[in-house]
Amino acid sequence: MNLVPMVVDQTPRGERAYDIFSRLLKERVVFLTGPIEDGMASLIVAQLLFLEAENPDKDIFMYINSPGGVVTAGLSIYDTMQYIKPSVSTVCVGQAASAASLILASGAEGKRFALPHSRVMVHQPSGGVRGQATDMEIHVKEILQLKRMINEIYQKHTGETIKKIETLLERDTFLSPEEAKKVGIIDDIITQRKENSGKQE
C-alpha cells in the first residue's frame, strides 16, 4: 500500500490539508511517475490543461521518473505539452526511458534538465502481434509509421539529423545526463537549486 504524505496549509480561513502531490500542483509542479498508460496519461493531460486555465503565462514544471510504456499514451502527453500556452520545463529524476525520454526531450527549449545520477533510455517502438498474416502486416506498417513519427519528434527537439536519431534509437540506448545533454535531449544537468529560486518575484 502506498501512503501519500499530507501537508497542512495555513490560510485566512484556517488550516487546510492536502496530499503532497495536490499541494505541489498548486505550485505548478506535475509528477510523471511509473509506467505510461492511458489512465496515467489522462491524469497528466488533465493537470496540464488545468494549469493552463489557471495561468496561461506561467511555466509548468514536470518531474519525470518513468520506465516508459504505451507509445500512444506518451504521444497524448507530448501533444498536450505542445498545444498548451505555458512553457513546460522537464526534469528527469531517476529515469526517463522509452516514451518518457521523448517527453523529457520535448520540454521547452532551454528548460529541459536532469539530475546528476538519473538515466535516460531511448529506443524504437516495439509491439508483439499475433493473428492472421494480413493483420500482422497492418500492425507492422503502423509500427513503422510510429517509428518515423517518433524519429521526427526527437529530431525536432534535439536538433540532430534523422540519420543520427535512427542510429541512436535502433536498439536500447542508455544515456548518462552528460550523454543526454550531448545529443540534445536535455539542456543542462542540475545539482542544486539556485539561491533565489524559491523566492517570490
UniProtKB/Swiss-Prot annotation:
InterPro entries: ClpP, ClpP/crotonase-like_dom_sf, ClpP/TepA, ClpP_His_AS, ClpP_Ser_AS. It comes from the Bacteria. The active site is at S98 (nucleophile), H123. It is found in: Cytoplasm. It holds the Pfam family CLP_protease. GO terms for molecular function: ATP-dependent peptidase activity; ATPase binding; serine-type endopeptidase activity. It catalyses: Hydrolysis of proteins to small peptides in the presence of ATP and magnesium. alpha-casein is the usual test substrate. In the absence of ATP, only oligopeptides shorter than five residues are hydrolyzed (such as succinyl-Leu-Tyr-|-NHMec, and Leu-Tyr-Leu-|-Tyr-Trp, in which cleavage of the -Tyr-|-Leu- and -Tyr-|-Trp bonds also occurs). One of its GO terms (cellular component) is endopeptidase Clp complex. Disulfide bonds: none annotated. The keyword Cell membrane does not apply. GO terms for biological process: protein quality control for misfolded or incompletely synthesized proteins. Gene3D superfamilies: 2-enoyl-CoA Hydratase, Chain A, domain 1. Its EC number is 3.4.21.92. CDD domains: S14_ClpP_2. Fourteen ClpP subunits assemble into 2 heptameric rings which stack back to back to give a disk-like structure with a central cavity, resembling the structure of eukaryotic proteasomes. Belongs to the peptidase S14 family. Cleaves peptides in various proteins in a process that requires ATP hydrolysis. Has a chymotrypsin-like activity. Plays a major role in the degradation of misfolded proteins. NCBIfam families: PRK00277.1, PRK12553.1. This is ATP-dependent Clp protease proteolytic subunit. The gene is clpP.
